[in-house]
């Protein structure tokens, strides 16, 4: 019983699907997918209760969301372990994700009150009131890299605003989604307010194309996001929020503390085995002795990064990638870059057949004439040597994406020069570019999204504004308009 529809756990009626631990191939979850007919039932269930959920009022909805926060707190160890087993991420990292899920509740409440609450102003024409109303039934498509935190960042603000939800998680992390729904159930969420449909492409297509959904919130690949964007092109009445990936640049310029720089580069490129949408993919290092020394130090540090299973002791920095297929894809990406003229400084290797375990890679692509503008979603960092700062910024901007970017530089003037010219939604200075604040918006430009920033701005796409001019009774104006007599 792995589908949660109309408050009931039911079996999927589609084909069999299995989730395995990518570090050792242990079966984590095994069931059947939801059929298009079951997706339809889920959407109908969400539609049936949506108005009642909205009319319950914000305070009553908030009480249930707060009860969910209590469930997250009580079960954070189980959440962290489930994420670790299903994604292969090390336990220290999944504990951080479980904590972020808890923190998201307070941030979402603050965002709702600040960006989509109710306000009144007296005007000569009457009382001007701004309110916000939910879109209705929204679909949430979750990713595998943060299977708890990222869908949580759509679901919580959607519910606070009064929407009901049909949640389709990644087929690679179904157990995490199942655990989330069990916690919502324990929190006392009314039947039908969230419905869970587990499945692969067929399930996703049935949900995305359903005529009765009012919006879709997606986190995932640029390829899938573009398909959804094309699909919704003729439906302006539906809200579509896309958070996609990036070919993210990091520039190094004039840093005295090379050890700190190496640390921030590693945290930018290799955390989560490179499976964060904000991970650095391209590193720009100045030519010359200083750049040579930094690169040598980085090369040595990358070689010493510890890779291991999710539960290894002492804990590794990098766990497994999400699957063996993903791991082999990174080996192939490295091979392609070498064939184009790249030189491996640290070779990325597939550590163990049948698993997602890979070692981190570092490759100098300075001699590659036509560098592919691709998001290689794994622990492979491309190095480009430069001589001129403007040249480095131009190269950094030479991408169809625009999610995150950063510069490590001791000079604030260099940072401000970079900030004014770089094209990205997240721009960090002397910090890893995978670092983002939940109290700020999260999103990019270009192929990285469709101008629907999430995190603190998720409240914006979960409700629409309703502007009213009001008076307590009908009354004549002091002066009638010219040409009128009553």
Swiss-Prot record:
Active-site residues are: 243, 277
* Molecular function as annotated in GO: succinylglutamate-semialdehyde dehydrogenase activity
What SUPFAM superfamilies does its record include? ALDH-like (SSF53720)
- Does this entry carry the keyword Oxidoreductase? yes
Q: Name one GO biological process term.
A: arginine catabolic process to glutamate
Part of which pathway? Amino-acid degradation; L-arginine degradation via AST pathway; L-glutamate and succinate from L-arginine: step 4/5
**Which residues are connected by disulfide bridges in this protein?**
none
Per UniProt, the keywords (alphabetical) are:
Arginine metabolism, NAD, Oxidoreductase
Q: Which CDD domains match?
A: ALDH_SGSD_AstD (cd07095)
Query: Any idea of its EC number?
Result: 1.2.1.71
Q: What class of enzyme is it?
A: oxidoreductase
Q: Which Pfam families match?
A: Aldedh
Question: What is catalyzed by this enzyme?
Answer: N-succinyl-L-glutamate 5-semialdehyde + NAD(+) + H2O = N-succinyl-L-glutamate + NADH + 2 H(+)
Q: What positions does the entry give for NAD(+) binding? A: 220-225
Give the family per the record.
Belongs to the aldehyde dehydrogenase family. AstD subfamily.
Q: What is the annotated role of this protein in its UniProt record? A: Catalyzes the NAD-dependent reduction of succinylglutamate semialdehyde into succinylglutamate.
Q: Which NCBIfam families match?
A: arg_catab_astD, PRK09457.1
- The protein depicted here goes by the name N-succinylglutamate 5-semialdehyde dehydrogenase
- What organism is the protein native to? Shewanella sediminis (strain HAW-EB3)
């Amino acid at each position: 019983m792995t589908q949660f529809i109309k408050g009931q756990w039911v079996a999927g009626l589609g084909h069999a699907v299995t989730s395995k631990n990518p570090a050792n191939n242990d079966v984590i979850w095994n069931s059947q997918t939801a059929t298009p007919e079951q997706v339809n039932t889920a959407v109908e269930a969400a539609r049936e209760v949506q108005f009642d959920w909205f009319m319950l009022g914000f305070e009553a909805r908030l009480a249930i969301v707060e009860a969910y926060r209590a469930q997250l707190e009580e079960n954070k160890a189980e959440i962290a372990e489930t994420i670790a087993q299903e994604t292969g991420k090390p336990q220290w990292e999944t504990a951080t994700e479980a904590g972020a899920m808890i923190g998201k509740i307070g941030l979402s409440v603050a965002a709702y009150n600040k960006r989509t609450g109710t306000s009144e102003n007296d005007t000569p024409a009457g009382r001007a009131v701004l309110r916000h109303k939910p879109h209705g039934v929204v679909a949430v498509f979750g990713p595998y890299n943060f299977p708890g935190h990222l869908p949580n960042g759509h679901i919580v603000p959607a519910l606070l605003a009064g929407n009901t939800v049909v949640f389709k998680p990644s087929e690679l992390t179904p157990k995490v989604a199942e655990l989330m729904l069990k916690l919502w159930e324990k929190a006392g969420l009314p039947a039908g307010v969230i419905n869970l449909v587990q499945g692969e492409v067929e399930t996703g297509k049935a949900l995305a194309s359903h005529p009765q959904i009012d919006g879709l919130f997606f986190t995932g690949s640029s390829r899938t996001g573009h398909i959804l964007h094309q699909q919704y092109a003729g439906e302006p009445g539906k809200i579509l929020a896309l958070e996609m990936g990036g070919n993210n640049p990091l520039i190094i310029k004039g840093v005295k503390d090379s050890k700190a720089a190496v640390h921030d580069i590693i945290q930018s490129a290799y955390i989560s085995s490179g499976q964060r949408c904000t991970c650095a993919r391209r590193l720009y290092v100045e030519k010359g002795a200083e750049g040579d020394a930094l690169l040598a130090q980085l090369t040595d540090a990358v070689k010493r990064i510890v890779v291991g299973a999710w539960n290894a002791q002492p804990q590794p920095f990098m766990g497994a990638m999400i699957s063996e297929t993903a791991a082999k894809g990174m080996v192939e990406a490295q091979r392609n870059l070498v064939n184009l003229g790249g030189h491996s400084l640290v070779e990325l290797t597939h550590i163990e057949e049948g698993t997602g375990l890979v070692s981190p890679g570092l490759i100098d692509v300075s001699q590659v004439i036509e560098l592919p503008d691709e998001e290689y979603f794994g622990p492979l960092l491309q190095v480009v040597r430069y001589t001129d700062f403007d040249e480095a910024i131009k190269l950094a901007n030479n991408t169809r994406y625009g999610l995150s970017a950063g510069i490590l530089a001791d000079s604030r003037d260099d940072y401000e020069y970079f900030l004014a010219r770089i094209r990205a939604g997240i721009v960090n200075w002397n910090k890893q570019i995978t670092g983002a604040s939940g109290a700020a918006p999260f999103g990019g430009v270009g192929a990285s999204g469709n101008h629907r920033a999430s995190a603190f701005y998720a409240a914006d796409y979960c409700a629409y504004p309703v502007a009213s001019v009001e008076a307590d009774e009908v009354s004549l104006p002091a002066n009638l308009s010219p040409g009128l007599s009553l």
